[in-house]
C-alpha cells in the first residue's frame, strides 16, 4: 500500500494524535514537496477515508499548494493541536472542511463552530467553507456510478 508507516515513525505512532498534519510535510516519504506556508492557498480539514482519496488525487495532479489536515478526535475538540497545525497558514490560505457524507450528516455540524472559533482566536478574518455532498435524506446515493461521480466532484472542487 502507498500509505504505510515506517519503522522510524513507530515511536510517533505509539500515542494517539488528535490532529494529523499532512504526510507530505514529512520529507522522508515520497510524496510531492509542498510549497512554503506563505504560498499554500488552501488548507483542507477532514476526517476519515476522504483524506486518502484527496491525497492520492493531489499526488496524481502534482498539486503543491494545498495542505490536508486530519482531525482524528472530534470530541472533546482538539483546539490546541489544531491551532498548532493551522497557524503557519492562517494569514494566507483559505480554510475548508471536506467530508464525503452529505452536509447534514458526517462531522460538519459538530466541528464547524470549533474550527471557526480556532480561526477567530488566531485572528484570521476568514470563514470556514464546506465542500461535500449536498444535504440528503439518505447517507448514500444507492448507485455506485452516482457515488463515484459525486466523489470525483468533491475532489475536483478541492483541487481547483
Give the residues covered by each predicted segment.
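Secondary-structure transition/capping motifs at alpha-helix termini
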Residues: 38, 57-67, 88-93, 118-127
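Generic long, charged, amphipathic alpha-helical segments
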Residues: 51, 56-89
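A general structural motif
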Residues: 14-25, 45-51, 72-81
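Single conserved hydrophobic/aromatic residue that forms the stacking wall/gate
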Residues: 1-8, 12
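Short helix/loop capping segments that flank catalytic or ligand/cofactor-binding pockets
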Residues: 6, 28, 52-55, 77, ...
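Short glycine-rich or small-residue beta-strand-to-loop segments that form or flank ligand, phosphate
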Residues: 45, 94-102
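Peripheral docking tails and interdomain loops at the edges
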Residues: 85-88, 99-160
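A short, charged/proline- and glycine-enriched loop
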Residues: 36-42
